[in-house]
Amino acid sequence: GNFAAATQSEVKRMLAYSSIGHAGYALIGLAAVTAGASANNATVMGAAMAHLLVYGFMNTGAFLFIAMVEHWGVGRTFEDYAGIGRKAPMASMAMAVFMFSLAGLPLFGGFFSKYVLFLGAINAGFWWLAAVGAVTSALSLYYYSRVVKALWLEEPTGNLDALDSKPTGLYAAVIVAGVITVLLLPGFGPVIETAEAAAAAVFA
């Protein structure tokens, strides 16, 4: 999924293919549990559940942003997103948070869920799975950062006057999703603990 995402020219298609990669991260947890590392079962499955939860907020927010851009009629490619940050700074800042968190950069929620997943895989003897996950996660930074680069660093290629009229519901939803994604960072400890408790109940 990550390799296909890296070749896309449309932002929505990139996100769709990257979803396959995130499903693969969760499967790393399943593989570790299947290996029979009972001492780590709850931790690894808890991390997988936490990653899916964090991913849900990040990805939902990103698709809401795309829906808003399509409402404006700007376009679908990375080039079409150029300069949007100047006309819609708050929503574009939220989109940057989604992209960096999806890429798993440190200090973002996506990093911690991946870290616990990869560590659990290593403890279960699947070091090669953790290595593959780390490499594909690094690759994802390339295509996620393309969105941020277009929004904030590139000159507009078309008329962005349509952005002066903001769809209130979509705009607010994007910003709220961005705030929740940021708040997941200090709240990640309780999130992972709750997920581990739920996983432990399954294996009890």
Predicted regions and their residues:
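Predominantly late transmembrane helices and immediately cytosolic-facing juxtamembrane segments
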Residues: 56-65, 69, 74, 128-163
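Hydrophobic transmembrane alpha-helices and their helix-loop junctions in integral membrane proteins
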Residues: 1-109, 119-122, 138-140
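Re-entrant/interfacial helical elements at transmembrane boundaries that shape
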Residues: 16-19, 111-120, 152, 190-197
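Active-site proximal loops enriched in glycine and acidic residues that flank catalytic Cys/His/Asp
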Residues: 18-19, 52-54, 133, 145, ...
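Hydrophobic, aromatic-rich alpha-helical transmembrane segments
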Residues: 44-48, 52, 127, 131, ...
